[in-house]
Amino acid sequence: VYRHINKYNNNYYICLCDDKPCGFIGEIDGDIRVCTDPEHQGNGVGSFMISEITKLRPHIYAKIKLDNISSIKAFEKAGYEKKYFLLEPKK
């Protein structure tokens, strides 16, 4: 994680909860990357970070796998809506 943030440090933000890192969010080529510490998941930290980065970069988007229900809920809570589906050949 830290190597990834260091490589794209102008595009990433660390979220603090009680002065300790509890998640990070960033953007690469318009695509949001977000991660919340498991101890803070389900407490609105993810949707808070999504809302805040959207204020800074209103034209970003998210690509989320259909089975990642918690991410879908966090983005919907932050005001995002489903727009497209990606279809891939069966493996």
Where are these regions (language model features)?
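Active-site rim helix/loop that mediates acceptor-substrate recognition in acyltransferases
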Residues: 1-11
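Conserved beta-strand-loop-alpha-helix junction that forms the acyl-donor binding cleft
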Residues: 62-81, 88-90
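Conserved beta-hairpin
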Residues: 10-23
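Conserved acetyl-CoA-binding loop-helix of GNAT-fold acetyltransferases
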Residues: 42-56, 69-77
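A short, internal acetyl-CoA/4′-phosphopantetheine-binding micro-motif in the GNAT/acyltransferase core
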Residues: 31-43, 64-65
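Short glycine/proline-enriched coil/turn segments at helix->beta-strand junctions
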Residues: 8-9, 27-31, 54-61
